[in-house]
Amino acid sequence: MFSLHTAASVSLYLSLAGSALAAVPAPAVTKAPTIVARALTTTLPASAGYTALPTARVITGSFDGKMVKYDRKGSSGACQEQTETGEADAVFILESGASISNVIIGKDQAEGIHCRGPCTVTNVWWEDVCEDAITIKQTGSGDVSTITGGGAFSAADKIVQHNGAGRVVIKDFFASTFGKLYRSCGNCSKSYQRSVTVDNVCLHGGSEGVGINTNFGDTATLTNIKTNGKPSSTNVCCTYNGVGSGSEPTKIGCGDKYSACKYTASAVGSC
C-alpha cells in the first residue's frame, strides 16, 4: 500500500539525486596544443655589447649572455690559428650540469667553450671559429650534452670536438665554411664509445658533417639534414678507425652504407 510517508521518501530521494547531478561540473574542453615550428637561423645576430675576458669564465649554474659578444682579445686565449691550445684558452668553461645561452663568441679566441661534464648550450653563435668551437669532456657513458640553436662560421677544422664519453645532441644549428660539424676524438689519451644525434641542421660549405670511430662502437643518428652541396649527402657522415694518443686515425669511408651512420642519404635536403 502506497502511503503518504512513502511518497514523501521518494520525493526526498529524487530531490537529493537531482541536486547531486546538478553539482557535477561539465567536463572541461581544452584546445589541442599549437605546434610551433622550430627555428633555424642562418644569420649571425647583432651583438648587444662586447666584453674581452682576460681569463676563461667558469660557469657553475646557468648563464644568459643576453647576446653580448665575448672573446679573449689581448690575452693568452686569443686565436692562435690551428696551434693546439687547451681549456685555459677557452672563453667559457662549463662545469658539469651548467648551461649557457644567448651568447656571441667573437673571433679573438682559441677554444670557445669547454664542457667539463654534461652541459646545455642554447643559441650560442661563433663569429669565427679558431681551433674548436666547443669541446665536450663528460666521462659518464650515460652523460648527454645538448647544443640547440645558434651557429658557427669559418671553422678551419672542427666545430664540436667530443673528447669524452656519452652522447652529444645537436639540433636547429647552422654551420658555415667548416671542416667537420662534429668529430668523435680518434686519438685521445682515453678512448670511449660515443654517440651523436643531429637533427634539423643546415650545413653550408663544409667538408664533412660528422666523423665517428666505428672500432670504438660510435654511432651517428641524423635526421632533417640539409646542405648546400658541401658536404655532399654522402659526406654528412664519415667513419674512421680510432687509434691511441700520438697516432692519426684512418678514414674508412662515408655514407649511409655504413651501419654506424644511421640516416638516409637520399633524404638529405638543401639549404
Question: Where are these predicted regions, by residue range?
Answer:
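Fungal secretory targeting signals
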Residues: 1-28, 32
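Generic hydrophobic/packing signal
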Residues: 12-18, 103, 111, 159, ...
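Extracellular beta-rich repeat passengers
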Residues: 32-55, 62, 67-84, 114-271
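LRR N-terminal entry segment and analogous cap-like coil->beta motifs
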Residues: 60-76, 86-90, 94-111
